[in-house]
Amino acid sequence: TEIQSAYLLGRRNHFELGGVASHVYMEVILPLLDIDRAEKVWNDIILKHDALHSIFTSNNTQKVLKEFAYYKIECNEGADIKEKIALTRDKLKGKSYNADIWPLFDISVSQLDDNSLLHLSFDFLILDWASIWILLKEFEECYFDGKTIMDNSYDLKEIRTSQLKLKHSSKYLSDKDFWERRIPFLPDAPLLPIKNKIVKNGFERIQLRIDENTWSKIKSNISEIGVTQTSFLVTILALVLNRWSSNSE
């Protein structure tokens, strides 16, 4: 897809801020897991989803592997569990995968006294954020509820073929024509005060949480004027960018 091509380009060191993979690392606390059983469920999930047993070749083609090894989950346990968790976290939180080597993910478990800490690391070449939550839901339903993993109705190739067919539809062509005519009139990117030289490519996630009462009032107010939550937040972002940008548009 177009976004996968962009991710592959961003992994290369051909330009400033390049050489960075699009990647997510997350931790999930679950009731105490039996590692062998959890491993079996994850392997069933890997087998079901083509993306989880795919790689990317040197000519930027996604290849679904027909044969691949049984995935072994790394398990941390013992008296020094805190140190092992820290080591796993440091190893995975900034991991960069070779796109042509399977797997493009890591799954580990740290066994605590009463819970298990699930460590998940995925390259966004194979999954997006919504897909990760689907995988987690599948794992929990299969492991805790005993549900059977159902086969997919479509494979990756069929889905991509359907997407490409949409590009020949009248609606797609009409929308494309509209935006191509708008391009000359779109404003430039905001000129923001930034560092001239980036010493190290890295990321830090900054979060702001709005308390439930305040957010309920916001939702009530914006719904009265027909504004969606997404539009509201994007507008705030635009106002902040405008505040710091040296070009008014």
PLM regions and their residue ranges:
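Short, charged/polar, Gly/Pro-enriched secondary-structure boundary elements
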Residues: 66-74
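Flexible, P/S/T/G-rich "lid" or insertion loops adjacent to the active sites of thioester-utilizing
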Residues: 10-19, 172-227
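Acyl-group handoff/entry surfaces in thioester-processing enzymes
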Residues: 2-66, 79-166, 187-193, 215, ...
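Alpha-helical hinge/cap motifs
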Residues: 124, 226-229
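Short amphipathic
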Residues: 25-29, 73-76, 204-211
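Short, intrinsically disordered, charge-balanced linker/junction segments flanking boundaries
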Residues: 245-249
